[in-house]
A protein has these predicted regions:
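Non-catalytic, mostly N-terminal accessory regions of nucleic-acid modification and defense proteins
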Residues: 1-98, 165-174
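Conserved S-adenosyl-L-methionine
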Residues: 79-190, 195-196
Length: 197
């Protein structure tokens, strides 16, 4: 399955969901020896959570956030994740507004992005606001596992087509990244990518 997903042939105008699947599995290794166990895990989650219900999806998101806290300490290839209290504080200080773009060029599992989304979610009142909310974030993550976790995090925060990319932002000119038509980002909320390889 991993090899098949990593080698998907994509049309030039492929939907972002297809691009995300290919990118997520390109560098992935399958350490699970038993496919039946994976199926059981998927079935258990599917039976327990109705992802069409906001409250259940939100509760699952909180569980997911708790699991991600385990990654906040060093030890995974020298990676450091910013504590949630810090990401929340920084987002509150920058106070992004609905309609502004928020970028994190070393987004890890999406801590800064979700802190910004939590502030933006309070401003959503109409379907038009929801559309602005869903297009407000932009992220780049070099490593495959944090990238996958970030995509999952965005989906749990009602971002159906996350503008999060599997890439190394240090290998490109920051001006090459475009979000809005004018190529500008309103808010850059991030820590530099120190540590890791």
């Amino acid at each position: 399955l991993f090899k098949t997903l990593a080698s998907l042939e994509l049309a030039q105008n492929a939907p972002l969901r297809q691009v995300v699947v290919k990118a997520a599995f390109t560098d992935a290794n399958n350490y699970m020896k038993d496919g039946i166990l994976l199926r059981q895990v998927v079935n258990a989650i599917d039976d327990a959570v109705d992802f069409t219900e906001y409250k259940e999806r939100h509760a699952f998101g909180e569980i997911y956030e708790t699991i991600l806290k385990d990654l906040q300490s060093a030890g995974n290839a020298g990676e450091f994740y910013t504590p949630r209290a810090v990401t929340d504080f920084m987002a509150e200080m920058l106070n992004p507004k609905l309609g502004e773009s928020v970028a994190d060029f070393a987004c890890g599992t999406g801590g800064f992005l979700t802190s910004a989304l939590n502030l933006l979610a309070r401003q959503v009142k109409t379907p038009a606001d929801q559309e602005l909310y869903s297009k407000s974030i932009y992220g780049i993550e070099k490593k495959q596992l944090p990238y996958l976790l970030c995509i999952t995090n965005m989906l749990l925060h009602d971002i159906d087509n996350p503008q999060v990319f599997h890439d190394n932002s240090l290998e490109h000119d920051v001006r090459d990244y475009r979000h809005k038509e004018d190529g500008q980002f309103d808010v850059v909320l991030m820590n530099p990518p120190y540590g890791g390889s």
